[in-house]
Amino acid sequence: MKKFIFFFKNYCYISGSMLLFSLIDLLLWIISLYCVGLVFWILFVLQCIYFVWWLWKNIFYQLNSFGLVNFVWDNPLSVIIGKLGTGKTLLLTYLSQTMKLLTDEIYSNYPLEDDKVKVLTFKNLDFTDRTKPVPPDDSVILFDESYLYIDGTSPHDEKKVHSGKIPWIVLARHFGNRALFTAQREGMIWNNIRQLASGIIIPISLKKPVIKKGFNFFNRFFIMQIGIFQDITDYEIWKTKSVERTAEGKRVKHKSDVGLGIRFFKIIIPLEFANKYDSQWLKFVRDLKNDEIVNKKEYYWSEITKLSVKERLELFDIDILKKNLKPKKEKGNGKDD
């Protein structure tokens, strides 16, 4: 039943993304009712071409959605790597909805407007912690901004602090957990996770809905192209070759290779999924700092000339200048004049 509901919803999303073309096809059909001869057959052929295109696209996107769900389910550890704005959190949120096809145990470390998604922190995965439990069998764990929790650029230092997470990382598949971690660079992900990850997901491009007055009904979908790799080494090789082709002025190839476990495909993400999370939910951290500041006076640059040199130096807070321009203590004379 879940698969049928998922298929039907996906069908509606995909059909909705092509609604404008469907209206054009309907218009052609209405016109053809009043035409005869060559014009009728031309319109008939155009309708047939549209129908074949619509059917192929619908099947194409349906298979891609099912393929992504199965890929995540088959890999206990996956990482999503992409620069700022490529849609990493959007993809996690999309999976928070589509993975319900296989399980009801969904956890995330960032807020989602979904009553079925549970809160998770890094302590849930720490075996030295005795306050929060490890998620049960068949759980999907969505972990955004992993760099905020573990500094992947300092693996040796982090290993001392986060050694309690290693048992979970190694035994995730035995626990029936499926986890996804995001980062802007592969080097930002902790080495213990990166090397054991059997799923590498790369958001390559993201076509956002264009918000225009009167056309919002036709622009309620994101189209994301992603690449999936089964090993970090395969991804690094592909990335190196892509950089070389770009440097030579050539187009980067997004060609799937089933033998190497490399696939590229597109998925449609409804705008309603994107509205389930706040991309700036961590802005409360700013308030933690600002609430402790007593003097919150701000200056305009036009007011700087009214300050003394010493006040300017204190205001700009340039440590090197403050250190070197600090008045030296005068040495006292050894004997009276």
Swiss-Prot record:
The keyword Metal-binding does not apply. It comes from the Viruses. It is a multi-pass membrane protein. Keywords: Host membrane, Membrane, Transmembrane, Transmembrane helix. Gene3D superfamilies: P-loop containing nucleotide triphosphate hydrolases. The chain crosses the membrane at residues 4-24, 26-46. It is found in: Host membrane. The keyword Secreted does not apply. GO terms for cellular component: host cell membrane; membrane. This is Uncharacterized protein ORF2. Belongs to the plectrovirus ORF2 family. InterPro entries: P-loop_NTPase. Disulfide bonds: none annotated.
